[in-house]
Regions:
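Hydrophobic alpha-helical segments typical of transmembrane helices
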Residues: 6-7, 54, 95
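Short, surface-exposed beta-strand-loop junctions and turns on beta-sheet-rich folds
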Residues: 52-54, 73
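Extreme N-terminal tail/first-helix region
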Residues: 1-19
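A short, polar/proline- and glycine-enriched secondary-structure boundary/capping micro-motif
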Residues: 55-61, 77, 105
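A generic structural signal for nonpolar/aromatic side chains embedded in well-ordered alpha-helices
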Residues: 10-12, 57-58, 99, 122
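Charged, gly/pro-rich active-site loop segments
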Residues: 1-3, 76-131
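Short beta-strand segments
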Residues: 16-50, 58, 64-68, 79
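A short beta-turn/loop motif at secondary-structure boundaries
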Residues: 27-29, 70-74, 112-114
């Protein structure tokens, strides 16, 4: 699915926008987490540690929604609804390091090195925009 050009800039590394990820708990209630992200081809890539709530939710219920807000204008945002189509630990440590460079300016992610990192590939299915 093609990203709306009017809001494509929110995905640029230099913007450093956070995504607010909505997953679904086993009870059916929503769970929202601010999260770092980047793009690879037409996929939105997310990263977490194995066993966290969002990890468990995305494995069990792969439909997700993300809201990405313009850091310079909170009334401008894009909502993405999609599906996690791939979950992998392969390359996930390098991916979180890449995200740490984008968001923190650090070469190495400063989190717990014993965590098993996981990368999630989200395939967008629908977009809506504001502003």
């Amino acid at each position: 699915m093609k990203f709306p050009e009017t809001h494509r800039d929110l995905f640029a590394d230099e913007v450093k926008a956070f995504a607010f990820l909505s997953t679904t708990m086993a009870s059916g209630t929503p769970q929202v987490t601010p999260i770092w992200f980047d793009l690879e081809k037409d996929y939105i890539l997310l990263n977490s540690a194995r066993g966290r709530v969002k990890d468990r939710n995305m494995r069990a219920r792969p439909n997700v929604a993300l809201a990405i807000v313009d850091p310079n204008n909170p009334y401008r945002y894009i909502q993405v609804r999609g599906k996690v189509i791939k979950i992998t630990e392969e390359g996930a440590r390098a991916h979180i390091d890449r995200l740490a460079k984008k968001y923190l300016g650090k070469k190495i992610f400063p989190g717990d090195p014993s965590e098993v990192r996981v990368t999630y590939f989200v395939q967008p299915e629908a977009f809506s925009t504001m502003g």
